[in-house]
């Protein structure tokens, strides 16, 4: 029987390159299809994150696209023929980046990132004749660093609704990044609450302030 998987909070980007070994001729292309996915690898079809691309080594970026015909975004970032950086909004959860080899053999590394998503890297190899073993897949690792504190002001005497997610910050092998994670809060006591974060060893902290001024806000 067919089953349908539903996506949840965007977590990272799945990146698939049609080629990971390019010829060092300055014209060989690799098309890297990027998909915003949740923690279970399911596509998030309504994701419209601004996706950022940075490449180092013996390749450059020559184009980005998201399939949205009415988009006013540039196919070539900053209108330059090739660059080491580009960016594009995802459309229906997807975005494409096109890499081109340089004329020198060597390695290349593409880093793909977006706010509140775990970054991903794609390793490529540029060889004299365009053949050879594919490079080892690049794996991004991260270590929890901190949780953004939650501060809420409510009208005096009113109950408070705390956010369902908090921002957890990481130090990673591809640079620092942040993820939004679900949180379950304790009861508010003396204007404070602690949160248990799903999939995290850290604890969230919330401070609730009552204000007569807040009661007059519209």
Kindly give the residue locations of the regions a language model identified.
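Short, hydrophobic beta-strand segments
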Residues: 80-103
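Short aromatic-acidic-glycine turn motif
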Residues: 10-14, 53-76, 130-135
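Beta-strand-rich structural segments
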Residues: 27-45, 51, 110-112, 162-172
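Serine/threonine-rich, repeat-prone extracellular segments and beta-strand-based repeat modules
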Residues: 173-218
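Edge beta-strands of extracellular beta-sandwich domains
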Residues: 2-7, 118-127, 216-218
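Proline/serine/threonine-rich low-complexity linkers at boundaries of modular beta-sandwich domains
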Residues: 2-12, 132-145
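Short, solvent-exposed loop/linker segments at the N-terminal edge
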Residues: 21-30, 150-160
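Carbohydrate-binding surfaces of carbohydrate-active enzymes
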Residues: 1-10, 14-24, 37-39, 47-49
